[in-house]
């Protein structure tokens, strides 16, 4: 069995925002999402077997590429999520929700739908192993009057959706 130390997620908008903020090229930043798995152990053969299993599992489920990333670079990108979003938009709404882990893809799709509907960029990072989803809704150059009108509408739809999945608001950390 594999017991990852953590399982993190970043959507493509969050990846590209971190990449611009850090001024560092990240792998496959032009498409897709990141699922960041950290494993640990003191037996190289066991770790190699776990990596092969993870590769097969991810590839079977549609991963573009599975790679052993530079841990410093990939964690720097993940940890910069909030700061990168603040650099992109001083005004934003940081939503902290938690849903069953199996519902994370539905939440990601719903957030993309809501972003398109309301004309805002939403960047997503998640602690995927416990269902905690952070969504930063960026105001950017939207007029303040419009922002103050659309944000509550978007939040109402998001919160209703989260509750419909059995989720909760203020997720730190997890209902898994």
Specify the residue positions occupied by each region the protein language model found.
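Noncatalytic alpha-helical scaffold of FAD-dependent oxidoreductases
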Residues: 1-176
